[in-house]
Regions:
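N-terminal, positively charged/glycine-rich alpha-helical extensions of SAM-dependent methyltransferases
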Residues: 1-27
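Class I SAM-dependent methyltransferase Rossmann-like catalytic core
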Residues: 21-40
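A conserved beta-strand element that flanks and buttresses the S-adenosyl-L-methionine
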Residues: 125
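Conserved alpha-helix/loop element of class I SAM-dependent methyltransferases that forms part
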Residues: 36-52
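Class I SAM-dependent methyltransferase SAM/SAH-binding core
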Residues: 65, 69-113
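C-terminal alpha-helical "lid/dimerization" subdomain adjacent to the S-adenosyl-L-methionine
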Residues: 157-198, 204-212
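A short glycine-rich, Lys/Arg-flanked "PGG" loop and its adjoining helix->strand segment in the class I
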Residues: 139-151
Length: 233
């Protein structure tokens, strides 16, 4: 596996070879998509919000790319990923087995958000997940992520833009092709409102255009003495 260095900037050039090698047991189309994903997903803007030595929960981890990257660059002490897709988790576990430190990663199959491990984490991450969740369930998912964020910890939320225009259309077409879903994008203002209701404070907000896509990034912090200090979901 071509490993990125701990001081990598996590740019596409840094990561494409790493992700291609990481999924060597996957079908060729998945390997190519994994190698191309750094050109679309702004890993370079997500990673800096993960503190050194953190315990990380990735809700909707898919094939485990983000957690694998965080271990490879020696960023985290432990990572737990969960997803509804058993095949994706199989690739995630295979990828972890190719990494030094991969034993610090665990991947759990869940049926619903209620199945997510009930423990506090320094960082909870949710990347390109919420738009796949039925609209009536989205607030519950954000609340569950917030409750699993340790006091003083951060909740990192990244999803696609809901602003009308070509970038939203590009992502809608992308999901039709690859996920066979006609999705309804998530309002970042709604996420901010739900997170605030769980006692989280917004500390960073970015709009990130990449290729034909548009991303919204929101980072929230749970006050050290804030509400919902335990993971009681």
């Amino acid at each position: 596996v071509r490993l990125p260095s701990p001081d990598t900037a996590c740019t596409p050039a840094d990561l494409r070879g790493f992700f291609y090698d990481l999924y060597e047991d996957a079908p060729k189309p998945l390997r190519l998509l994994s190698a191309a994903r750094p050109y679309v997903c702004p890993y370079d803007r997500i990673v800096p919000f993960v503190p050194q030595g953190a315990r990380v929960l990735d809700v909707g981890c898919g094939t485990g790319a983000l957690l694998a990257l965080l271990v490879a660059i020696e960023r985290i002490a432990e990572g737990v990923g969960c997803d509804v897709s058993a095949p994706a988790l199989s690739f995630a576990r295979g990828a972890a087995g190719r990494l030094a430190g991969g034993e610090r990663l665990r991947f759990d199959h869940i049926e619903t958000i209620d199945g997510v491990v009930d423990a506090p984490f320094d960082v909870v991450v949710m990347v390109d997940v919420l738009h796949h969740v039925p609209e009536a369930e989205r607030q519950k998912v954000v609340a569950a992520a917030a409750r699993r964020t340790a006091p003083g910890g951060v909740f990192i939320y990244k999803d696609m833009t809901d602003e009308p225009g070509g970038r939203r259309l590009a992502h809608t077409i992308d999901d039709l092709i690859f996920s066979h879903e006609l999705v309804r994008q998530v309002s970042p203002e709604a996420v901010e409102h739900w997170a605030a209701g769980e006692g989280l404070e917004l500390v960073a907000s970015e709009y990130l255009p990449r290729l034909v896509y548009g991303h919204v990034l929101r980072v929230f912090r749970k006050p050290a003495d804030g509400p919902n200090a335990g993971a009681d979901a």
